[in-house]
Amino acid sequence: MGSHAWGGAVFSAATLIAFGSVVHASGTVAETAPQSGHAVPADQLDGETLYKARCAACHDNAEGRTPSREVLSKNPASFILASMRTGAMVPMAEGLTLEEMTAIARAVGKADAKTDDGIDLRRIWGNSVEGTPLDAPQCSSAPTPVDLGAANQWNGWSTEKDNGRFQRKPALDVADIPKLKLKWAFQYPGSKNGQATVIGDRLFTTSTSGAVYALNAKTGCVYWRHAAEGATRTSPVIAALPEGAPAKTALFFSDFTKAAVALDAETGKQLWKTVVDDQPALQMTGSITYWDGKIYVPISSGTEAFAQIPTWECCKFRGALVALDAATGKILWKRYTTEQEPRPFKLNKAGRQMWGPSGGAIWVTPTVDEARRLIYVGTSNSYTDVPYDNSDSVMAIDADTGAVRWTVQLLADDNYIDGCWQKGKEHANCPNPLGPDFSIGAAPIYRKMADGKEFLLVGQKSGMIYALDPANKGAKIWERQLSLGSALGGIEFGTAADDGKVYAGVSDIASQAKDRGKPGLWALDIRTGEVAWNFLNAPDTKCRWNNWWCHGAFSQAISVIPGAIFAGSYDGHFRAFDTATGKIIWDVDTGTKAVTTLSGAKAFGGVMDGAGPTIAGGMVYVHSGYAGRSSESGGRDLRGTDGNILMAFSVDGK
């Protein structure tokens, strides 16, 4: 699912980034080849020769969203080194010593600021935040204890385990929405972040720099900051621990060290860390779900990008869901999205062994059906010609045992690798035929109506939205085509539902249509699938950033309260719509004018994508400036004022 890694300049949309798509945190080095006892110092190595041997094949002939060398050169050498050590390029850097990686980084990147001799890993922008100044003032007084009974909360990806993203108690009247004004803005380190979680007076959030923050929800001051050992973009979830545990409440997240992590929610101290899988190209994108003493961790992959490299051994990854004991971090069960283990099936055009089946990544946050004790997930496309039985599927998994109770495949044979759609290029690992990359990127929504009728609502990058029957093994109740879809949606991150309607944001940024599709927001009757209203946004909108990402796409997750729905779009506009009519109630441009952040710096918002609005305690929190797409480099220079900011709105800014 190429959509869940951030993009670069004016690149076509069907691709994951092959370099630096995630920025990892910590000076802790991920596993690489053993270091020689007689390593040659980096300053004695020819970084240019090493680059040509290991990197040029992709970056000198950049395709899709793979950044060109010119784009890479705008980044500090430390960022490039971090990508090879602990980031998305770890598989590509296999066998290189630290000195060789450093030589490549110096040859390609620009000199780092604020370093004395060589590269100071303690000051990597986008790498470890440890030892750097806080991004907002420290709170002057201690917080009250974390109260999971607080009325004002939004805990994790959604307010409830059904993933409806429906805040029933927002402490915000629809009549007051036009009076919302910016109260404070917090500039994240890193290029992306997890959605904010609010519990009482605490706000918890994560970033791809590895920074996990606890802020005051009303003022934005910092209670604590934890430096994780890897990039994280998942939404924190908070839960009580059993008596005798080392903390009363825990904060759970996953990171790109292939691990689930628990922190003491009061202090940020790490309680445990468990590596949940060790497959090649593994990523952690979907947020964790906590329920009944367990956490459920979805596993996704960057295989589509890495497989562009002819010498990369494609493809061994299988998506999975892992259940852990929340108190101890012990793995209770792991369910791959197919029972078939990848096996050798042919040599690619470069003579490398190919494996299959492979694919079925889980990009979404797991959904809980409490009555049936089932976990629902959506899966991604497959990567090879070998059929993958549960690709582009909805799966119902037993919450206690991990057994698969039923599956519904929405699209078969969606076999996809980045760059393969470009004609005239040699691609060693391309499946035949090539699929459209129509993964399920939005978490399934479980909704039980007042009369007991049940629905499982599923949006897909194909532009389709489905209502399945959870009481009848996922049988289709209705389906509706909202757009032609694309590798970046169609429906990407964003669906939400109240008690009568389901709402879907349509991206269409990568649409093959000449007019770049019909981005917008749709409202449908949950029972029938009939369209109640839709809002179409101009694809050729104007933005401060003059690049391919200036588009009217509604890709970011959306959120609903009684009477209003909040949605951000690629053009930087954050809007509230009347749920009955679709009329715009409120519209703020987050990307045109710089705002003063809590650190005192000026920063811009911009492209709105990924994790969506959090609404709690009469305030609305949303991030703007996703992945640097609204900067001059279109997503590669992570420093400066072009995002990535968390904006907190309140009535009259009070």
UniProtKB/Swiss-Prot annotation:
GO terms for cellular component: periplasmic space. PROSITE patterns: CYTC. Its cofactor is pyrroloquinoline quinone. Optimum temperature is 37 degrees Celsius. It is found in: Periplasm. Residues 42-159 form the Cytochrome c domain. Monomer. This is Polyvinylalcohol dehydrogenase. It comes from Sphingopyxis sp. (strain 113P3). The gene is pvadh.
